[in-house]
Amino acid sequence: MANFIKPYNDDPFVGHLATPITSSSITRAILKNLPAYRFGLTPLLRGLEIGLAHGYFLMGPFVKLGPLRNSDIALFSGFLSTIGLILILTLGLTIYGVAAFGQGQTTENSNDLQTKKAWDQFKGGFFVGACGSAGFALICLSSIPAFTIS
């Protein structure tokens, strides 16, 4: 097993161990396809895509595991809970943006999420995408018979 784990780039001072998982090309390909690392996306589209995923998968736990799961309004209360959590997450993104970027750092490349303007676009895309996908999940769960909640 010691032959598989070695220092990253044969430099023991980096502080990262290269394992077969962390240094494989498959892992790199999967990580490069995530919207946070994909090349050529604007901050708005990054936030939109990340928000779409989060809004959609946050709906299920609130509907199936929420305190009103056995009532007639389980779906609607799960939707409202999801929107509430999305608001809290967006507030957290806002606080991080104010703390990290403060006032007016401007650079020529606005696609790197390291400026206030780019972070605000990311945050807006996240909010719109998450609320939209939570609404889409609500429509799917309420109208498609295969997805009905019992």
From Swiss-Prot:
InterPro entries the UniProt entry points to: PSI_PsaL, PSI_PsaL_sf, PSI_suXI
TM regions (residue ranges): 73-93, 124-144
Main location: plastid
Stromal face residues: 1-72, 145-150
Lumenal side: 94-123
Bilayer disposition of the protein: Multi-pass membrane protein
Record's keyword terms, sorted: Chloroplast, Membrane, Photosynthesis, Photosystem I, Plastid, Thylakoid, Transmembrane, Transmembrane helix
Pfam families, per the entry: PsaL
GO terms under cellular component: chloroplast thylakoid membrane; photosystem I reaction center
Location relative to the cell: Plastid, Chloroplast thylakoid membrane
Coiled-coil intervals: none
Single biological process term from Gene Ontology: photosynthesis
Family to which the UniProt record says this protein belongs: Belongs to the PsaL family.
Listed PANTHER family: PHOTOSYSTEM I REACTION CENTER SUBUNIT XI, CHLOROPLASTIC
Protein name as annotated: Photosystem I reaction center subunit XI
Organism: Trieres chinensis (Marine centric diatom)
